[in-house]
Amino acid sequence: MTTLKGRDFISLHDWSRDELEEVLELAMWQKARLKAGIRDEPLKGKQLGMYFAKPSTRTRLSFEVGIRQLGGDALFLSAHDLQLQRGESIADTARVMSRFLDGIMIRTFSHREVVELAEWATIPVINGLTDEEHPCQVVADLLTALERFGTLPGLKLAYVGDGNNVAHSLMDGGAKFGMHVVVASPEGYQPDPARVARAQVTAARYGGLVEVVTDPVLAVTGAQIVYTDVWASMGQEAEAEQRRKAFAGYQVTAELMRCAAPEAIFMHCLPAHRGEEVAAEVIDGPQSAVFDEAENRLHAQKAIMTLIMA
């Protein structure tokens, strides 16, 4: 654990496979102890500042409950609670927060804002979500897949829909574990080509594969994991109708799920829009792992906080 103390958690690309395996192993261990009624407090007396420029159900619940289960405490900060909106620099904000806190979780729009905060902070910074990446979510996804299948290398994960922040982090995470990640998106909504190329290099190193296609059936065929996300993310509401038309053939339906492996599970980072990116019979059906996945945000983030803040 000492090797990771003080580290930032901004992108899965920044962490080695061994380090991510340590996160997953600790998450499973802590989860088992919690279920057994054993309470560990490795973060006793520690304070986590949670800055939310974008609101969230799962991110706030999992971080706030998580650090309290670990013996620490959390301070919620909205955009209205800080002076950033009035022109105070990120550098000054980071240096001030570092004097009061033991860690910072930030959920915001600009990825550059998180990177800059980490550059100036003298305490660990955790990326709770940006428009470019969602690493904590994908650690929870990997944990869920590991629990279901017992291993990660060789699994095929098909992501159907918008090539957004979740798709970027799934490519990074899947590549690190030698998975076959296929993203199916319409032209104009595919993942960032530079991030695809980066993930492909990583995948080749670990015996995996990362692909981008336009055909959902091709992507899903034989997959153990079928994943989707909303078609219009927070801040894209004005594009909602345009996106509904673009993604009309990308809904995860029962018919599409039949193309996947017999043991396939369905995953979604939530919130979900039933009848848009996923049919109700899929997300509410027996193959759905979405609520296990949501719970695993708690366990994944507890492990991350323990490793970098204890």
Curated annotation (Swiss-Prot):
InterPro entries: Asp/Orn_carbamoyltranf_P-bd, Asp/Orn_carbamoylTrfase, Asp/Orn_carbamoylTrfase_sf, Asp_carbamoyltransf_Asp/Orn-bd, Orn/put_carbamltrans, OTCase_ArgI. SUPFAM superfamilies: Aspartate/ornithine carbamoyltransferase (SSF53671). GO terms for cellular component: cytoplasm. GO terms for molecular function: amino acid binding; ornithine carbamoyltransferase activity. It is an enzyme of class 2 (transferase). It holds the Pfam family OTCace_N. The keyword Transferase applies. Reversibly catalyzes the transfer of the carbamoyl group from carbamoyl phosphate (CP) to the N(epsilon) atom of ornithine (ORN) to produce L-citrulline. Belongs to the aspartate/ornithine carbamoyltransferase superfamily. OTCase family. This is Ornithine carbamoyltransferase. The lineage of its organism: Bacteria, Bacillati, Bacillota, Clostridia, Eubacteriales.
